[in-house]
């Protein structure tokens, strides 16, 4: 606290260094998230192969959809890392400008990057806090969030899902399901095991639900 109870403003250099540290910390969170999702993806792909061997095409399609959604989630996380790197580079530039002019400068590049970062649920709270601090410091202006992003993503998912599902099934089953990139219409190969399949159907369904829950938790 300063004189008369007023809070003393922090030096701009300290602010920039603190923002950079917070962003690097969130990047490590994103890296862990990506690794977790990718590990789960490999489990799902193994399950697709097992379901294909048993002749369970419906399970294969359900699992392939999970892979599609997971890949989209990972792509978004990588895009967010790129935005974070952009902000970090801008912070370095701010320090260079600060040494010359003695003050922080407004940056449209940081503004655009932060607009994208505040939309990511995994780091939303931290990015909102940083945005407020940057607005107060004069680096960015008040941001208006794009409320149409979710709808746009859903439309894109509908358009590309079938093609991507077919591609994944073809890739994971080594061509047992259809021909990439055309639509999968082929029947699955005959089941390798016929004896205990009926008894294992319920267990397989439970495994599918558990895997779906784990992937959903990682993406949320």
Curated annotation (Swiss-Prot):
Top-level taxon of the source organism: Eukaryota
Membrane topology (UniProt): Lipid-anchor
Localisation per UniProt entry: Cytoplasm, Cytosol; Membrane; Endosome; Late endosome membrane
Motif annotated as MIT-interacting motif, chain positions: 201-209
Lipidated residues (N-myristoyl glycine): 2
Site entry: Interaction with STAMBP: 214
Keyword Nuclease among UniProt keywords: no
Entry function: Probable core component of the endosomal sorting required for transport complex III (ESCRT-III) which is involved in multivesicular bodies (MVBs) formation and sorting of endosomal cargo proteins into MVBs. MVBs contain intraluminal vesicles (ILVs) that are generated by invagination and scission from the limiting membrane of the endosome and mostly are delivered to lysosomes enabling degradation of membrane proteins, such as stimulated growth factor receptors, lysosomal enzymes and lipids. Involved in late stages of cytokinesis. Plays a role in endosomal sorting/trafficking of EGF receptor.
Quaternary structure (record): Probable core component of the endosomal sorting required for transport complex III (ESCRT-III). ESCRT-III components are thought to multimerize to form a flat lattice on the perimeter membrane of the endosome. Several assembly forms of ESCRT-III may exist that interact and act sequentially.
Protein name per UniProt: Charged multivesicular body protein 3
Gene label: chmp3
């Amino acid at each position: 606290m300063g004189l008369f109870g007023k809070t003393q403003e922090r030096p701009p250099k300290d602010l920039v260094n603190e923002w950079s540290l917070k962003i690097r910390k969130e990047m490590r969170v994103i890296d862990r998230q990506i690794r977790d999702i990718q590990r789960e993806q490999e489990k799902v792909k193994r399950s697709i192969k097992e379901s294909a061997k048993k002749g369970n095409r419906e399970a294969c399609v359900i699992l392939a959809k999970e892979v599609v959604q997971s890949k989209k989630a990972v792509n978004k996380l990588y895009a967010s890392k790129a935005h974070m790197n952009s902000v970090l580079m801008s912070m370095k530039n701010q320090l260079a400008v600060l040494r010359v002019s003695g003050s922080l400068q407004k940056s449209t590049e940081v503004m655009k990057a932060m607009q994208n970062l505040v939309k990511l649920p995994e780091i939303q709270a931290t990015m909102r806090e940083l945005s407020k601090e940057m607005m107060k410091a004069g680096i960015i202006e008040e941001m208006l969030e794009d409320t149409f992003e979710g709808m746009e993503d859903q439309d894109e998912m509908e358009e590309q899902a079938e093609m991507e599902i077919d591609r994944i099934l073809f890739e994971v089953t080594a061509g047992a399901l259809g021909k990439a990139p055309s639509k999968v219409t082929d029947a699955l190969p005959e089941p390798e095991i016929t004896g205990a399949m009926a008894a294992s159907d319920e267990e397989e369904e439970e495994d599918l639900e558990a895997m779906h829950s784990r992937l959903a938790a990682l993406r949320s």
